[in-house]
From Swiss-Prot:
One of its GO terms (cellular component) is cytosol. Gene3D superfamilies: Alpha-D-Glucose-1,6-Bisphosphate, subunit A, domain 3, Alpha-D-phosphohexomutase, C-terminal domain. Catalyzes the reversible isomerization of alpha-D-glucose 1-phosphate to alpha-D-glucose 6-phosphate. The mechanism proceeds via the intermediate compound alpha-D-glucose 1,6-bisphosphate. This enzyme participates in both the breakdown and synthesis of glucose. It catalyses: alpha-D-glucose 1-phosphate = alpha-D-glucose 6-phosphate; O-phospho-L-seryl-[protein] + alpha-D-glucose 1-phosphate = alpha-D-glucose 1,6-bisphosphate + L-seryl-[protein]; alpha-D-glucose 1,6-bisphosphate + L-seryl-[protein] = O-phospho-L-seryl-[protein] + alpha-D-glucose 6-phosphate. Its cofactor is Mg(2+). SUPFAM superfamilies: Phosphoglucomutase, C-terminal domain, Phosphoglucomutase, first 3 domains. Its main location: cytoplasm. The modification Phosphoserine is found at residue 124. This is Phosphoglucomutase, cytoplasmic.
Length: 583
């Protein structure tokens, strides 16, 4: 048993270590500066306080992006020096964000210990590699992201930090092999437990879904399946879950070997970046696929996001969460007793609202950021929730969960096809979506992302939109001058949320223009990029007339798109003639 001692290292603050909704994200070149990561980790320990750190059991893992392995060793040594009793690390340092949440909530160590929190090393859907992004966030004992009270303290601490603690004489831990390594320090024993990355997560998923029913679907010659992990950490879980447990053919897995640079790609599961899957599913504009699979899905870098596709058919994330909620009680055993409630982020379409109304469910509209859902779940008020940004999840953990969403869709397909895997036509993904629209109406929806725009220009654009809201009459005059065929604005505001659980108020959560016919325009500045500002524009139109629900989305939304771009003076403020990504 190796002994270590504790060193106090003098340091000075770095500017800009303010964690956003998903932790601290910066370029790798920023993180590898001497003391940079250490300052943030020590600021986190100090914010948590001795009672939450000394004797604690912490999970330290991530999506495997460049610099993760070095960061794991640094955090482990700092944990030892700060009096943490145990560090749990997924084999090779790999755990998806939902798997971390599952481990914190469910795993019991060999000595009966339970995790009290986690450092997750991820920048989610942002690119990885020496010249790309790295990130770190802290999750609490409920498996969810640290609340603002903690993240604000972390930031305050980064502005005044003078020293950090690190173990001296503690060797690097071999994270490629499972097993427990024990060490002795000034405060007693310190253990590092490297464990199988998928077992605890899989056990939880098997308690939620009817795996034999999904297996029956996947083994049917009628059904074909494709899963693309975009070289992110979800690939670690995919083979075990889809191939070994559910019997899918290994050839159905694409890009499922995790890579530090995500294979040079952008690990964001949308129609722009998941090119290989999009082509395979028959949705490429340049490549014709004669026989696409029935079902396809993609994950992001840390496995918490998902994109769902049918044969030549894209399911919007806003529709996806609504359809899962509408079918959950029948198709997913975990929900057989009913749903406690449902929730969506404000920019997400109102498709879920209509389902909640029909099914008489509690409904919540929250700001962007999974922690708001976590509060509702901890209070027993919400079972299923989702975001338009390809995040879907439930109260089984406190993070969004990409593989959970895929299994939810496979469960719905298995349920709808339980009597026709032999004779009869398969009920397809497209059939399920169109049946949903026929019952609940369709929310035509698109999102325009303007990435890495000049921060001052972005702020000026938002200020312009807020100023316009002072006179709805003036706004409607401007709109009629742009398009006479667009409905009137009846309400305009900056979205503000009062949490029904703790009473906290979140202001300035996005600018909204709500129209008489149920249409919406929403503008947000996003804080998850590592450089510049990202403006997100959300455009939504509700159509109840069943004869009009089959139109092309961009065609149906064209009048509102024109209004949004001209009303906001998008090109004038951003110098961009087109968005970076259209979803």
């Amino acid at each position: 048993m190796a002994n270590f001692k504790v060193s106090r290292v003098e340091t000075t603050p770095f500017e800009g270590q303010k964690p956003g909704t998903s932790g601290l994200r910066k370029k790798v070149k920023v993180f590898i500066q001497p003391h940079y990561l250490q300052n943030f980790v020590q600021a986190t320990f100090n914010a948590l306080g001795a009672d939450r750190v000394e004797g604690a059991t912490l999970v330290v893992s991530g999506d495997g992006r460049y610099y993760s392995k070095d960061a794991i060793q640094i955090i482990t040594k700092m944990a030892a020096a700060n009096g943490v009793r145990r560090v749990w690390i997924g084999q090779n340092g790999l755990l998806s964000t939902p798997a971390v949440s599952a481990v914190v909530r469910e795993r019991v160590g060999a000595d009966g210990s339970k995790a009290t929190g986690a450092f997750i090393l991820t920048a989610s859907h942002n690119p990885g590699g020496p010249h790309e992004d790295f990130g770190i966030k802290y999750n609490m004992e409920n498996g969810g992201p640290a609340p603002e009270g903690i993240t604000n303290k972390i930031y305050e601490n980064t502005t005044t930090i003078k020293e950090y603690l690190i173990a001296e004489g503690l060797p690097d831990v071999d994270i490629s092999t499972t097993g427990v390594s024990s060490f002795e320090g000034p405060k007693g024993k310190f253990d590092v437990d490297v464990f199988d990355s998928t077992s605890d997560y899989l056990k939880l998923l098997k308690s939620i879904f009817d795996f034999p029913a999904i297996q029956k679907l996947l083994s049917s010659p009628k059904f074909s399946f494709c899963y693309d992990a975009l070289h992110g950490v979800a690939g670690v879980h995919a083979k075990r879950i889809f191939v070994e447990e559910l019997g899918a053919n290994e050839s159905s897995l694409v890009n499922c070997v995790p890579k530090e640079d995500f294979g040079g790609g952008h690990p964001d599961p949308n129609l722009t970046y998941a090119k290989e899957l999009v082509a395979r599913m028959g949705l490429s504009k340049t490549h014709s696929e004669p026989n696409p699979p029935e079902f396809g899905a993609a994950a992001d870098g840390d496995g918490d996001r998902n994109m769902v596709l049918g044969k030549r058919f894209f399911v919007t994330p806003s529709d996806s969460v609504a359809i899962i909620a509408a079918n959950a009680v029948q198709a997913i055993p975990y929900f057989s007793g009913g749903l406690k409630g449902v929730a969506r982020s404000m920019p997400t379409s109102a498709a879920l609202d209509i389902v909640a109304k029909h099914l008489n469910l509690k409904f919540f509209e929250v700001p962007t950021g999974w922690k708001f859902f976590g509060n509702l779940m901890d209070a027993g008020m919400c079972s299923i929730c989702g975001e338009e940004s390809f995040g879907t999840g439930s109260d089984h953990i406190r993070e969004k969960d990409g593989i959970w969403a895929v299994l939810a869709w496979l469960s719905i397909l298995a349920y709808k096809n339980k009597d026709n895997l032999g004779e009869g036509n398969l009920v397809s993904v497209e059939d399920i979506v169109r049946q949903h629209w026929a019952i609940y109406g369709r929310h035509y929806y698109t999102r325009y992302d303007y990435e890495n725009v000049n921060a001052d220009g972005a702020k000026d654009l938002m200020a312009h939109l807020v100023k316009l809201q002072s006179s709805i009459d003036e706004v409607n005059k401007l709109i009629k001058g742009i398009r006479s065929d667009v409905s009137n604005v009846v309400h305009a505001d900056e979205f503000e949320y009062k949490d029904p659980v703790d009473g906290s108020v979140s202001k300035h959560q996005g600018i909204r223009y709500l129209f008489e016919d149920g249409s919406r325009l929403v503008f947000r500045l996003s804080g998850t990029g590592s450089e510049g500002a990202t403006i997100r524009l959300y455009i939504e139109q509700y159509e109840k007339d069943s004869s009009k629900i089959g139109r092309d989305s961009q065609e149906a939304l064209a009048p509102l798109v024109e209004v949004a771009l001209k009303l906001s003076k998008m090109q004038e403020y951003t110098s961009r003639s087109a968005p970076t990504v259209i979803t």
